[in-house]
């Protein structure tokens, strides 16, 4: 697990606590553009009930069915979504923020699209949070440090 994964996982642990105390569904949007490894790794580590990644489009019905199952078992559902995730039927990732410095769409906001739909279709109060730039900071994990040391050692020899 790398810095981004552990920071995202810690944030999701806090979201789970909030969801549990209020019996809400929490949607956590993480960065990653068109690659879902941050969402996948942190979602698995945090015990998310639904993980939405760009590589695997899902329908709103599939998402809400999993949310409802978790809620029916007495859980406060946690949904982790990568910013580049597309719902089945969407042509491209959600973007309403213009273009970035490389003239690509600025991704983000899919969590705010999903949350009210989950709420509407399940009747479960749902909140969305974008983890954003907080994922970019933090101290390297032990794994990160060992990996960097090994890479340095191999490149030196």
Question: What spans do the regions from the language model cover?
Answer:
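C-terminal non-catalytic interaction/assembly regions of soluble proteins
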Residues: 106-156
């Amino acid at each position: 697990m790398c810095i981004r994964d552990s920071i995202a996982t810690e944030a999701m642990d806090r979201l789970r606590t909030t969801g549990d105390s209020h019996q809400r569904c929490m949607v956590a949007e993480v960065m990653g553009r068109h690659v879902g490894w941050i969402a996948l790794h942190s979602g698995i580590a945090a015990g998310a009930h639904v993980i939405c990644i760009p590589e695997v489009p899902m329908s709103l019905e599939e998402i809400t069915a999993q949310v409802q199952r978790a809620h029916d078992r007495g859980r406060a559902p946690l949904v982790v979504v990568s910013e580049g995730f597309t719902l089945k039927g969407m042509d491209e990732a959600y973007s309403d923020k213009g273009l970035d410095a490389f003239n690509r769409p600025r991704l983000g906001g899919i969590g705010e699209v999903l949350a009210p739909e989950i709420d509407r279709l399940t009747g479960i109060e749902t909140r969305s949070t974008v983890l954003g730039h907080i994922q970019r900071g933090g101290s390297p994990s032990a794994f990160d440090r060992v990996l960097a040391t090994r890479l340095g050692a191999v490149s030196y020899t």
